[in-house]
């Protein structure tokens, strides 16, 4: 049996950051024809759910264990969103400066890069491309506060399924 090696030089990896986000509004045919740069992304959180074990018994013993389907859920946090995202978030411009909320939400895709690093090359090791598809925005809270002596930009938290 081969001896296990731990903490080898160049084999201690990590992942960090979120950058170069792209929105892909879905067209009526179900395709994603055009990507739009999304500036101001502060976080992209992936929260899968499901995949629960379902034990089955026969002859007084555990016969098998079936695993349920996994569902993807994610949250995008950003200082702003591109104008093209408004339709995906249930907003429609009805006149200059007037927006109607609670409209039908357009499905979309989303992509972003995260940095891959290791103990020898640091953050220059590489990157990972994350692709989300079939997303639909869910309503989320938005707070508007008065400007004061320590203002903070509004941070949108957009929940997607």
Q: What do the predicted segments below correspond to?
A:
Residues 1-45:
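Polar/acidic, low-complexity leader/linker segments enriched in S/T/G and N/D
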Residues 3-9, 62-151:
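Extracellular/virion structural assembly segments
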Residues 16, 30, 49, 100-104, ...:
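Alpha-helical protein-protein interaction elements
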Residues 43-50, 128, 132:
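Membrane-targeting and insertion segments and their boundary/processing signals
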Residues 48-59:
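N-terminal "mature-chain" segments and other terminal, solvent-exposed stretches
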Residues 154-157:
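Terminal interaction module
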Residues 160-161:
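Conserved small/polar residues in nucleotide/adenosyl-binding loops
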């Amino acid at each position: 049996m081969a001896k296990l090696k731990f903490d080898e030089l160049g084999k201690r990896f990590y992942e960090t950051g979120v950058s170069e986000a792209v929105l892909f509004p879905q067209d009526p045919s179900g395709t994603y024809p055009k990507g739009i740069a999304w500036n101001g992304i502060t976080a992209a959180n992936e929260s899968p759910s499901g995949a629960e074990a379902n034990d089955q018994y026969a002859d007084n013993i555990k016969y098998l264990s079936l695993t349920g389907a996994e569902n993807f859920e994610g949250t995008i946090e950003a200082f702003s969103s591109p104008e093209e995202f408004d339709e995906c978030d249930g907003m429609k411009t009805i006149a200059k400066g007037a927006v109607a909320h609670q409209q039908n939400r357009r499905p979309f895709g989303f992509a972003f890069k995260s940095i891959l690093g290791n103990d020898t090359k640091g953050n220059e090791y590489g990157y990972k491309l994350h692709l989300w598809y079939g997303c639909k925005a869910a309503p989320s809270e938005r707070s508007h506060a008065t400007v004061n002596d320590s203002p903070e930009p509004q941070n949108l938290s957009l929940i997607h399924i």
